[in-house]
Amino acid sequence: MEIRNREEQKPFTTKDGSTIRSFLDLTNSPVKEQSLAEATLPEGGSTERHYHKLSEELYYLLEGRGVMEIDGQTQEVGPGDAVLIPAGAWHEIKATKAMRFLCCCAPPYAHEDTYFE
């Protein structure tokens, strides 16, 4: 059985600029098909526009507000919103109010699968 507590996961900054606490991923558990992490962005912060060749992502907004951009389309997002980011889609999220959200990737997140403009 694999159980990870949020407080035991050390935050780090990913290649896209968000701060992450990785709950279950290739580095800390025997996951094979997906990964789960919590991301935070300060008010006014954003991820760098990027895409993943292999991973489909799901974001689930817990706190804050922002603007999600996927392949040139933008929409305001907030608590309770779930966002699908298809593999290969350029995307970026900007925090208009400090944000906290869950990220699920399938296959699991890997730095090597993150590409920038």
Predicted segments, located by residue:
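Histidine-centered metal-chelating micro-motifs
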Residues: 46-48, 83, 87-92
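Ligand-binding loop in jelly-roll beta-barrel domains
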Residues: 87-111
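Short acidic-glycine-tyrosine-enriched beta hairpin
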Residues: 72-87
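Conserved short histidine dyad/triad with adjacent acidic residue
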Residues: 37-53
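Glycine- and acidic-residue-biased ligand/ion/polar-headgroup-sensing regions
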Residues: 54-56, 60-66
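A short, N-terminal "cap"/entry segment at the start of jelly-roll beta-barrel domains
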Residues: 1-33, 48, 114-117
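A cytosolic small-molecule/anion-sensing beta-strand core signal
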Residues: 62-63, 78-79, 97
